[in-house]
Amino acid sequence: MPPDASHERVSRLTGIALMCGAVACFALLDTTAKYLNLYMSTLQVVWARYTGAFLFPFIVSNPWTRPGLTRTTRPLLQLVRSVLLLASTLCNFAALRYLQLDEAIALIFSTPFFVAALSGPMLGEWVRWRRWTAIAVGFVGVLVVTRPGAAGFHPAALLSLTAALCYALYSITTRILARTDSNETTLFYSNIVGALALLPVVPFVWTTPGDPLVIALMVATGAIGSFGHYLLIAAHRLAPAAVLSPFIYTEIVLVTALGFLVFGDVPNRFTLAGAAIVVGSGLYLLHRERKVRGTIDQASKVSNQ
């Protein structure tokens, strides 16, 4: 095997390992948030998550030494993006108060369908019939999980879908900002906006935890989320997004296991069937995205010859 090919293979495998680590952090974060919801307001949990994530870089290093950390060419878009992420987190954590982990994450995985549908009007990346079909099938999976009109339907499922929509809009604005602002700058604004926005509200809903474990988990939420995002960024520096994206779906396995171990939750047949449809449709979307990008890259090479 040529040295360059060997180096690329090692980089990709390392990137995949980092991606799996990031996904594990996000699964642990959702589990921790659901557990903390038993002892305090969702607003307090979300505030702890963003405040901890903002302070975490100061513990492991001095972020102010990084030149241009706060410099952004699009401050309004940074604010919009940060508010979208905050709204997504609030809706997700609120849904976790009522839904099982596996149900909530299955609905959150509808995010790629929202992204694909919104990329046309917002980014000019129009979706063709194959991907529209995958989107439609994916939402059938969402309906299987939520079962609207059935006895098993819980209104909190709408919170999970709202979280997915907000996260899709957040992802699209992130792609726009990536053209001008660094990852570190974008992370900085996400965390500080979330922490400051909830600060005036938190005193009115504050509950002082008496259990040392609850205090430790409350402090840890920010570190877990922040570390997960750093692993995610590191993974994308080592391997292409098309290689890494399918591993996002390992989170549903992790949260199902954690839901059973921590809360004794057993997924029902509707959640399992719906999750399988959602994951299958999402993987097909990734396959089509990879194929379309490959065709574009090939055409670009030919035109440059």
Q: What is the role of each PLM region?
A:
Residues 4-6, 54-74, 139-152, 194-214, ...:
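Membrane-interface helix-cap regions at the ends of transmembrane helices
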Residues 14, 39-87, 166-169, 189-205:
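Transmembrane alpha-helices of multi-pass small-molecule transport proteins
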Residues 14-22, 61, 65-91, 155-163, ...:
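Loop-to-transmembrane-helix transition segments
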Residues 23-31, 58, 82-90, 112-117, ...:
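Hydrophobic/small/kink-forming positions within alpha-helical transmembrane segments
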Residues 34, 42, 57, 150-210, ...:
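Transmembrane alpha-helical segments that form core, pore/gating elements
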Residues 92-94, 111-133, 253-272:
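C-terminal transmembrane-helix exit sites in multi-pass transporters
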Residues 104-110, 177-193, 229-260:
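Helix-helix packing/entry segments at the starts of transmembrane helices
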Residues 130-146, 270-289:
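Hydrophobic transmembrane alpha-helices of multi-pass small-molecule transport proteins
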